[in-house]
Amino acid sequence: DLHSFPTRRSSDLNLLNMVGHSYGNMSIMFYMINHGTDTTLPKLVKQVNIAGAFNGVIGIDEPDDVRLDDNGKPSIMNETYRALLNVQETYPENQVDVLNIYGDTGNGGDGSVTVKSAKSLRYLISDVAKSYQEIEIDGSDGRHSKLHETSKVDDPLIKFLWGK
């Protein structure tokens, strides 16, 4: 819950890792839009996005017939994605390692979020991130609700965050 995040830097919390699933990713992104340049707050060093609906949710607000260019830029952007473009002005340059995990059950998405919507994160932050990597989880483990309940996600997430 981002509402319980510290509002000022304390000696106990100087560095921060964030992990979001589904709409939790929007909380991370809007936190960075609103506070990404605030040096009084803990420094974000690692960000994990799981099943991020950056350019919409299937059947709700995802544009039809979206294509991504090589940089992850969607050919059509929904209203939320256009607001997320502001993160390009506030995201700390060469500071944050980013891991983007998404699912594909065989139909181009995880049942709630398309691969294209999840992969559109690349356009938002890969140019300023310290590193950016993507992992696709295929098959039944790639279902939206399963993505936070499988070792196919847990293992690379733990290795990314803690090097274990």
Predicted regions span which residues?
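Short, small-residue-biased leader/transition segments that mark boundaries at the very start
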Residues: 2-10
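Soluble periplasmic/extracytoplasmic beta-strand elements of cell-envelope proteins
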Residues: 17-19, 102
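Phosphate/oxyanion-binding active-site loops and adjacent basic polyanion-contact surfaces
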Residues: 4, 23-24, 149-153
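Gly/Ser-rich "nucleophile elbow"/oxyanion-hole loop immediately N-terminal to the catalytic nucleophile
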Residues: 9-17
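Gly/Ala-rich beta-loop-alpha elbow adjacent to hydrolase catalytic centers
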Residues: 19-28
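Helical cap/lid subdomain of alpha/beta-hydrolase-fold lipid enzymes
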Residues: 32-164
